[in-house]
């Protein structure tokens, strides 16, 4: 006897009136999923159709909520990797809209009617902004590291300090990327101290390159030392090797003066090594991309690598990056939202917080606090900010606000909203959402 005979037929569930408004493929998928799940945990109790439909509707609602949605970043982390890192300014989006929604000359030369280079759109601007010989763009900085090493050092050896063999988000480790690129790693120095002589003594006939990796997502304090890229480049040049700086983050122009100490400036570094790469969506404040700058002959080798086809960027990335570069070249820094949020002064942040506090129907306290740069950038630096704190169970409040797409944080056992990362055009929306919430 079939023990599942009490289960309603799948077709009966799909055709039920209460699911009529949902697309067929979606309701069919979840009807099958819920029934299969109940069969796995089968008990002899009779399964009612109403109970199944209730569970199916719950699954469908959860599915719709899982769509990519805009959130209000009240966490105080400016470059929040889990929230998409840098935000694109509305005017930059509008400038890209015509390209994205239509055919474009992404790889077509309008002057001669022949195939063109998809990188031509941004190459001139990158060379202009950073004063480098040549440039290339791939889909992120991990891809940039992989491409550089695979193109220039395949089946050879590179030298790197033990103190710079970092792990970035999602458990991606520099040594693993090096290995995957077909390159042998020679580690030198210790976790806290590496000297120039350590690199020099490690050079062998199989050495191709000296790698320096910027410690952008952690800070070494106390008894430590490292070798700067300029000295490494001079050593590499003397020994007939290449020097490569995996910068990861790095800044371009107009950054808050409190942040720039010990944080490398890209334009300066590109003159001090053969090749470097960094992320487009960190301190540069644009779209996700791996931006590679360096000597022309080295970039040409990268362009000849068959892997570039797999790592190339699409017209969306190129369009947004192009508009960001134009904003930098025109010194229109207000359009680089990451820079704006990092540069906003304390009085402006206080005004935003006071405006919201005044219009909320719930009691809050205004306090000074600290914001973080985030995105694996400047881990040892923080920025003054203002927060609003809410009374009540902090964890429950955090969950309530998160369900309304407001991402705050818990500080000193209180749920808080940090106004450095809440943009001015989000304030009224924030007020409306909170005032509609009940029993805070």
From Swiss-Prot:
EC code(s) of this entry: 2.9.1.1
Chief place where the protein resides: cytoplasm
Entry GO terms, CC: cytoplasm
Cofactor(s) in the UniProt record: pyridoxal 5'-phosphate
GO biological process, one term: conversion of seryl-tRNAsec to selenocys-tRNAsec
Entry keywords, A to Z: Cytoplasm, Protein biosynthesis, Pyridoxal phosphate, Selenium, Transferase
NADP found in the keyword field: no
SUPFAM superfamilies: PLP-dependent transferases (SSF53383)
GO MF term list: L-seryl-tRNA(Sec) selenium transferase activity
Location of the protein in the cell: Cytoplasm
Catalytic activity, reaction form: L-seryl-tRNA(Sec) + selenophosphate + H(+) = L-selenocysteinyl-tRNA(Sec) + phosphate
Function: Converts seryl-tRNA(Sec) to selenocysteinyl-tRNA(Sec) required for selenoprotein biosynthesis.
Protein name: L-seryl-tRNA(Sec) selenium transferase
Organism: Campylobacter jejuni subsp. jejuni serotype O:6 (strain 81116 / NCTC 11828)
Phylogenetic lineage: Bacteria, Pseudomonadati, Campylobacterota, Epsilonproteobacteria, Campylobacterales
């Amino acid at each position: 006897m079939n023990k599942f005979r009490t289960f309603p037929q799948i077709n009966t569930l799909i055709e039920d009136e209460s699911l009529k408004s949902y697309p067929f493929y979606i309701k069919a998928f979840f009807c099958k999923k819920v029934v299969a799940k109940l069969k796995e945990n089968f008990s002899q109790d009779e399964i009612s159709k109403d109970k199944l439909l209730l569970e199916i509707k719950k699954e469908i609602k959860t599915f719709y909520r899982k769509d990519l949605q805009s959130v209000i970043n009240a966490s105080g982390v400016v470059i929040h990797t889990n929230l998409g890192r840098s935000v694109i300014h509305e005017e930059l989006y509008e400038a890209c809209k015509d390209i994205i929604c239509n055919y474009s000359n992404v790889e077509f030369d309008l002057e001669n009617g022949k195939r063109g280079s998809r990188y031509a759109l941004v190459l001139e601007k990158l060379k202009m902004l950073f004063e480098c010989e040549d440039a290339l763009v791939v889909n992120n900085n991990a891809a940039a590291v992989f491409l550089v090493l695979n193109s220039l050092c395949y089946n050879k050896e590179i030298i790197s300090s033990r103190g710079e063999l970092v792990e970035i988000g999602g458990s991606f480790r520099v040594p693993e990327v090096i290995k995957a690129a077909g390159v042998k790693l020679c580690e030198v120095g210790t976790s806290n101290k590496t000297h120039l002589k350590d690199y020099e003594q490690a050079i062998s006939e199989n050495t191709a390159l000296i790698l320096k990796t910027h410690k952008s997502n952690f800070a070494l304090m106390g008894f430590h030392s490292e070798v700067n890229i300029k000295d490494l480049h001079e050593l590499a040049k003397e020994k007939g090797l290449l020097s490569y700086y995996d910068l990861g983050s790095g800044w371009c122009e107009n950054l808050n003066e409190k942040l720039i100490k010990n944080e490398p400036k890209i334009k300066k570094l590109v003159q001090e090594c053969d090749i470097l790469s960094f992320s487009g969506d960190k301190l540069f404040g644009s779209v996700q991309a791996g931006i590679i700058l360096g000597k022309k002959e080295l970039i040409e080798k990268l362009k000849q690598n068959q892997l570039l086809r797999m790592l190339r960027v699409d017209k969306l990335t190129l369009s947004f990056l192009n508009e960001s570069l134009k904003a930098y070249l025109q010194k229109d820094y207000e359009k680089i939202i990451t820079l704006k949020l990092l540069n906003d002064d304390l009085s402006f942040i206080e005004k935003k917080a006071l405006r919201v506090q005044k219009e909320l129907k719930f009691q809050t306290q205004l306090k000074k606090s600290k914001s973080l740069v985030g995105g694996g950038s400047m881990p040892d630096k923080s920025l003054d900010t203002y927060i609003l704190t809410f009374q009540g169970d902090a964890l429950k409040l955090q969950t309530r606000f998160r369900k309304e797409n407001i991402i705050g944080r818990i500080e000193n056992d209180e749920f808080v909203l940090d106004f450095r990362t809440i943009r001015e055009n989000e304030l009224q929306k924030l007020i409306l959402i909170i005032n509609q919430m009940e029993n805070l």
